[in-house]
C-alpha cells in the first residue's frame, strides 16, 4: 500500500535526523527492521531533509523545500486550511513527485512552558536553533502563549552565522555540558547567570 511505503520512506530519512519528529515516524513504522538504507542524507536547515533510498531521491520537509526542488503541491490555501493552531504539514516527495502529506500537531510541554514562563518573568528572551524544519517563531508563540519578541527562531542565514560561535573548541573560557531536559538546561543557564 502506498501509505505504508510513504511511512517507510519518511521514517528512513528521519531515523538519523530531526530529533523532534524522528520518533513520530519510527512509531508509525513500528518494525524498525523495515528502515531502508539512506545514502547521502542531507539536512536543509529550516526546510527538511534529502536522501537517496533505493536510488530514488527522497525529500521530507516543508513547502519551502518542495518548492526549491520543483515539486508540485496543493495550494497554499489548502495547506493553511489544514494547519491551524499548532498543526503543520510535512511533505514527502519521491523522484520529484509529491508522494504523501502528513499532518502533525505540536503540543506544549508543561516543563518547557514553566521554564519559558520563568525566563519571560525574569526579562529574558530565547533564541532557538532547531533541527525541526516546522519550528518557527509563530509556532512557539502559539504553543506556549508567548508575547511577540519573547522567542526568536534562527533563520538559515542566522544559523550559518552562529555555526563558528557554537562550534566545539578544545578549550574555552567557559562551557556547560548538557544531556538532560530543556528545563534542566535552562536551570543550568539560570544558575550560571546567578553566579556571574
Label the model's feature ranges.
Residues 2-45, 67-69, 76-78:
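ATP-binding catalytic core of ATPases
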Residues 41-48, 64, 82-85:
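ATP-binding glycine-rich phosphate-binding loop
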Residues 15, 88-95:
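Short conserved beta-strand segments at catalytic cores or DNA/RNA-binding microdomains
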Residues 84-91, 124-125:
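Helix-loop-beta junctions that constitute the ligand-sensing/allosteric loops
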Residues 53-55, 94-196:
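Conserved ATP-binding TGD loop and adjacent catalytic N/P-domain core of P-type ATPases
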Residues 62-63, 70-72, 104:
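Surface loops and adjacent helix of pleckstrin homology
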Amino acid at each position: 500500500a502506498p501509505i505504508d511505503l510513504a511511512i517507510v520512506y519518511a521514517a528512513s530519512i528521519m531515523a538519523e535526523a530531526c530529533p523532534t519528529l524522528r520518533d513520530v515516524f519510527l512509531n508509525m513504522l513500528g518494525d524498525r527492521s523495515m528502515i531502508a538504507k539512506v545514502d547521502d542524507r542531507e539536512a536543509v536547515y529550516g526546510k527538511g531533509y534529502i536522501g537517496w533510498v533505493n536510488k530514488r531521491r527522497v525529500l521530507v520537509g516543508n513547502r519551502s523545500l518542495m518548492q526549491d526542488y520543483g515539486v508540485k503541491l496543493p495550494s497554499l490555501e489548502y495547506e493553511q486550511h489544514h494547519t491551524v493552531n499548532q498543526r503543520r504539514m510535512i511533505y514527502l516527495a519521491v523522484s520529484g513527485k509529491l508522494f504523501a502529506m502528513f499532518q502533525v500537531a505540536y503540543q506544549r510541554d508543561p516543563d518547557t512552558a514553566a521554564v519559558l514562563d520563568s525566563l519571560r518573568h525574569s526579562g529574558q528572551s530565547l533564541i532557538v536553533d532547531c533541527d525541526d524544519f516546522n519550528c518557527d517563531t509563530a509556532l512557539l508563540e502559539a504553543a506556549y502563549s508567548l508575547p511577540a519578541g519573547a522567542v526568536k527562531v534562527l533563520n538559515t542565514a542566522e544559523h550559518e552565522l552562529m555555526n563558528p560561535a557554537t562550534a566545539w573548541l578544545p578549550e574555552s573560557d567557559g562551557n556547560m555540558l548538557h544531556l538532560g531536559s530543556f528545563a534542566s538546561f535552562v536551570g543550568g543557564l539560570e544558575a550560571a547567570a546567578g553566579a556571574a
